[in-house]
Amino acid sequence: MKTTKYITIVTLLALALAACDTQPEALDLQPLKQYSEAYYQALRDYKASEHEICYVYYADWAPIEGASGYKDPASWGERIIGLPDSIDLVNLWMGIPTPETHPVAYQDMIETREKKGTRFIFHADASNYNHRFTIDGRAYDLSSDRSEEAIRAYARWVCDTVVKTGLDGADFDYEGWNGQHLTWAIEECDKIFGPNGRYPDKLVIVDYFSVSPPVACDPWVDYYVKQAYSQQGAGVGAMGHPDEKTVYCESFGQKPTGGEIFNYAAWEPATGHKGGCGAYYVERNYYNTSDGVPYGAIRRAIQIMNPAKKQ
């Protein structure tokens, strides 16, 4: 009888402890494949060479829009370091990771830049004038002041942000400003990031949808990124800008398995070459692939533009 009572008590105690243990265990991500230093050196050399680039807009490293605080990644699709190695440029939608605000994303960014040669771009906004900022000791508000001085001050603030956060350039999202304002801003950036500026290795990029940026910006722009979303019928064609500076981006938000990106990767102008191709919402292609490989479409597009050399 005593033995039966003892077994019953132990059983009930075990069940009680099991019931209390409701905290789910943290899932360990499968480790990424590690490569030799020779591989990474070859990767950095490739990205430093003249080739058609892959440019992506990536947001899943950060909390969802409107949320704040730290995000605990649930998969490599939510990690910067999980992006394909051969991507050249990553536009950081949703802000800029810092050691204080997003420690995992920040460390991923630093490691990816140093080890893989990937460059990271600040998303500047030329779609509206709701910008309040301070630069050179003076506060500006573009919603009420759109003078040449204020527009050029915004460009300096953008450049200052890029430098202070250790990023590699700025992308002006041209979807609302008039052409003269964009021209002033890009010309001002050239004074800082251009060949005669203090930071000549920083990039100046303009992405656009329906209205083409003024050709007056051509001497100062490293890349024009055309929002060539296939569901809206957009296609290739530099719209008056140099072909070698034009990058065509599909939207994986609408076409997560690739859409027109393979055609953009294969297309070439009659003479010379295009700047490259890429995708908005590249994270949507992490799971949605036709071949079962994470980011399968973007990997295939890179191979179409720049086939791997046979050993």
Indicate residue ranges for each PLM-predicted region.
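Residue-identity detector for glutamine
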Residues: 23, 30, 34, 41, ...
